[in-house]
Amino acid sequence: MKHYTLKPFQLESKHISQIHNIIEKVVSEKRDEYWKNYTDYSVYDQTMITVSTINDEVKAFSSIYTRDFYGDDVYRLFNRFLVSDDAREDCGSKMYKGDHRFLEMIDQQVKYVKTLNPKFYFLSRQRKNTRWLRWYFDKYNKQYNENMVVSDKQYWICKGNEYGCCQTLIYPKDKIVPFKSYK
């Protein structure tokens, strides 16, 4: 699996089409718990897109994203991560040919966002159980010589309800979280 992190306009049209096909399937089937998150997704609203390909076909993607709510120079990484159905078995949720399939994707995004001199950058997840997140990011930190930490509490990352907007953050240990904590 190869990973490429590009500005939206740098993506090949076939890759944009493949991303849209993955999204369309998720939205039309409504089986993914978060399918509604993809109804208004636009490749062109993202700061950068990372695609994971096998034989030049997109099998997974995620993006670097910012919004007014975050404040200036704050970026969300690993935004809207999806894997195509035909790659779920090959790529699995964890590994592809012995490598954790999304760690390189995350590292490419971390490296890129650092070039922007950000005030803060983060990944977030709606789930409160952090055991697996801590395991993955311990592995990530060792493999890529980084210092990402998983928050002990949840933070408001958007205007909305508690379920969708209060999330666990993964962020650099030396950065100060700019969001209000939940409870």
Regions found by a protein language model. Give the residues of each.
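Short amphipathic alpha-helix that is part of the acyltransferase structural core
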Residues: 1-36, 51, 183
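Conserved beta-strand-loop-alpha-helix junction that forms the acyl-donor binding cleft
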Residues: 121-137
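Conserved acetyl-CoA-binding loop of GNAT-fold acetyltransferases
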Residues: 135-152
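Short, high-confidence coil segments that cap the C-terminus of an alpha-helix
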Residues: 47, 115-119
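A conserved beta-strand-loop-helix scaffold within acyl/acetyltransferase catalytic domains
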Residues: 30-83
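Charge-rich, solvent-exposed alpha-helical interaction surfaces
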Residues: 18, 22-26, 108, 112, ...
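Conserved acetyl-CoA-binding loop-helix of GNAT-fold acetyltransferases
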Residues: 83, 89-113
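C-terminal "cap" of GNAT-fold acetyltransferases
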Residues: 149-183
